[in-house]
Amino acid sequence: MTWTMLPQEYHTGACFDLYRHLGAHPCKGGWSFRIWAPGALDVQLEGDFNGWQGAPMSRDNAGVWSCTAKAKEGQLYKFRVLGPDGSWVEHSDPCALAAELRPGTASRLFDLSRLEAQFTDGVWMAGQDKHYDRPMNIYEMHAGSWKRKPDGSWYDYEELAQELIPWLVEHQYTHVELLPLAEHPFDGSWGYQNTGYFAPTSRYGTPVQFARFVNACHLAGIGVLMDFVPVHFAKNADGLARLDGTFLYEYDSDVGQSEWGTCNFNFYRGEVRSFLNSAAAIWLDLYHCDGIRMDAISRALYWLGDPSRGVNQGAVQFLQNMNQGLHQRFPSAILTAEDSTNFLKVTAPVEYDGLGFDYKWDMGWMHDTLDFFATPFDQRRDAYHKLTFSMSYFYNELYLLSLSHDEMVHGKKTVIDKLWGTYEEKFAQARLLYFYMLTHPGKKLNFMGSELAHFREWDEERELDWMLLRYPLHDAFHKYIAALNGLYHAEPALYEGEYNAACFEWVACQSRDEGIYAYLRKGRGGPLLAVMNTQPKAYLKYPLYLTEGCTARMLFSTDLQQWGGTTRAPSQPQATLPSGVFGRNHTLYVDLPPLSGALYRLEELPRKPRG
């Protein structure tokens, strides 16, 4: 058979569809197989179709080994590679589209042309956008531990969709973000140590079933975001590590090993860049995902994630080129960076020397918020700034507020269990914390179980504690989250123009002794006033000073009895009085229950008729 050459872009790092060129694909008379292994002395193909007896492959000048075989879809295969040291090692296909269930390590034949027929989401795809002026409220989840069957086994992708989608719709989330689904050998890595970058993990079914999962989400109005690991990969000998007997995908020095015991990708090699470009693109292209969240970007930007070792310029160029290429091919895709550093211009366009991401996780907001709500009440005066500081830098990037899986494990406790106070006070504080999150500028992300007020830390081997819904406070809390998310959807001022400084204004940000915060969100429908009392004492007729006279109509309170609070019903509308301080000549007096928040719509005062 005459082989076509790989596109030149592959070697320069500009290829975004490698899954169409390498790996295994049906061809006339069987299947074609290709693997890039330039340092190998020999490569053989073995699988179900040849009794696992190595069949010879031929090498081209670029180091790509190829052959054809009479095989059938669903059969398993591997490449047997002879390295420069004279040893043979079996490897899974780096570009395999499907894989054997662990502990097996073989690749599985799959025809990618079958995927497009699974989708009926044309209307959704035509309406995709980056949600800059739309609500974006993300439910982060691990597919294997959200819910399990009565016998403890996993739901497959289609079964998971049937269980999950009604829950997402009920709680008015806009997107689901899946912890990495690329194939991985170790359950305890949560998907962050990959061996198969192009294959949805076989734990939960087939590529076709995953495509149907995405399609079902789209038909229900739910976007799908994929967590992606572009910095490091599993060190397993059957994967990418020393694939051709040399340091091919990884660095060959001390920077080749990550803090997790994995191998760091060599961003200076064009073929590695093309591999990663394509590994991200496949989720957007073949599986219709709406965006990519890129993990551990700080570990790429700086050598070993250490700013003192300097910026990794190869990684910077890789991220810029990848983001630019993805945006060109998928203009509506949402690209998000998990980056805990102060690296500048993460969300600036590449043409302005930025990295080209659409959003960046606000790790500072997360730490400050959790630290504040864990602080004893009598020490909060000194911690008051933790809830105001985020707005001093918020407009430097396009930030996304996240309370992710990383904050629910390894002894950190879950969100509600971190919070200071008695059992009842923890619930009041949790309602207040999420109110603060939903009324603060920035897109939102919460990890599964947070809506249940989950006290047990996340364990990938167990489903969530769904029995919590039998307890009144937990049942009320998940209904509270659904209502709060609904409020976010319903009020444009909570998401439109949120990256415009003119759409936010502090009303009370120096009330340290009282623990009171108040701020305006401005948008269509008029301004909204958010007020928070972070102390376990009530304030009656607390004064808030405004620049315009208005009537304040309560839209939402965290303290309603239906949520587990003490207030029977929202307060009646209150008009400002013509007195004030500091150039704010109108005073609004509000009653603030302990550990509570409220959102008011500010309406113009009726005009007095002319006499």
Per-range role (PLM):
Residues 1-134, 157-168, 172, 425-427, ...:
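Carbohydrate-interacting/catalytic domains
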Residues 58, 187-191, 235-242, 347-348, ...:
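Short glycine-biased active-site loop of nucleotidyltransferases that positions the nucleotide triphosphate
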Residues 165, 169, 214, 280-284, ...:
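Non-transmembrane alpha-helical segments in soluble domains
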Residues 197, 201-205, 267, 309-311, ...:
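Short, contiguous acidic/charged loop-to-helix segments that flank catalytic cores in large enzymes
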Residues 288-290, 304-460, 489-544, 548-557, ...:
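Conserved alpha/beta catalytic core and glycan-binding cleft of carbohydrate-active enzymes
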